[in-house]
From Swiss-Prot:
Subunit relationships: F-type ATPases have 2 components, CF(1) - the catalytic core - and CF(0) - the membrane proton channel. CF(1) has five subunits: alpha(3), beta(3), gamma(1), delta(1), epsilon(1). CF(0) has three main subunits: a, b and c.
Function according to Swiss-Prot or TrEMBL: Produces ATP from ADP in the presence of a proton gradient across the membrane.
Topology with respect to the bilayer: Peripheral membrane protein
CDD domains to which the protein is assigned, alphabetical: F1-ATPase_delta
Family membership noted in the UniProt record: Belongs to the ATPase epsilon chain family.
Keyword annotations from UniProtKB, A to Z: ATP synthesis, Cell inner membrane, Cell membrane, CF(1), Hydrogen ion transport, Ion transport, Membrane, Transport
Gene (UniProt): atpC
Gene3D superfamilies xref list: ATP synthase delta/epsilon subunit, C-terminal domain (1.20.5.440), F0F1 ATP synthase delta/epsilon subunit, N-terminal (2.60.15.10)
Protein name in the entry: ATP synthase epsilon chain
Signal peptide range in chain numbering: none
Organism, scientific name: Colwellia psychrerythraea (strain 34H / ATCC BAA-681)
UniProt-recorded Gene Ontology molecular function terms: ATP binding; proton-transporting ATP synthase activity, rotational mechanism
Stored InterPro entries: ATP_F1_dsu/esu_C_sf, ATP_synth_F1_dsu/esu, ATP_synth_F1_dsu/esu_N, ATP_synth_F1_esu_C, ATPsynth_dsu/esu_N
Localization of this protein: Cell inner membrane
Superkingdom, natural source: Bacteria
Length: 140
């Protein structure tokens, strides 16, 4: 008989955000979007800033914003080790918009002291937060 669920743990340095049985996980890996379901091949990959859409064993969904991290898939267990993880409901749209504006302003600064890689990463995190907020407002 095929597996119907797999165990998922989502943890950050601050806390454990999710632990339980799931039907599926949609997440942004370093090479693009990933769909993880029971029976998925073992995998280890880095994660980009974005949304983790969790479909729990009972069919309900939970959305978590991830700033990046690592994903490990084993036969009966999936682990997300996030740099920073926040439940979508706890994201602050105004703060994300302000962070995006700051990053864009820093990107357009004409000084030689701009660390473009750091500014681009800051911009990617802010845009990813806004996408999660928009996706969850459509979901609700």
């Amino acid at each position: 008989m095929a597996l119907l669920t797999v165990n998922l743990n989502v943890v950050s340095a601050e806390e454990s955000l999710f632990s339980g049985s799931i039907k599926s996980l949609q997440i942004t890996g370093s090479e693009g979007e990933l769909g993880i379901m029971p029976g998925h091949a073992p995998l280890l990959t880095s994660l980009k800033p974005g949304m983790a859409l969790i479909t729990k064993a009972d069919g309900t969904e939970e959305v978590i914003y991830l700033s990046g991290g690592m994903l490990e898939v084993q036969p009966n267990n999936v682990t997300v080790l996030a740099d920073v993880a926040t439940r979508a409901a706890d994201l602050d749209e105004e703060a994300a918009l302000a962070a995006k504006q700051r990053a864009e302003d820093n990107m357009n600064a004409h000084g030689g002291d701009v660390d473009y890689a750091a500014v681009a990463a800051e911009l990617a995190r802010a845009v990813a937060q806004l996408r999660v907020i928009q996706a969850t407002s459509k979901h609700s």
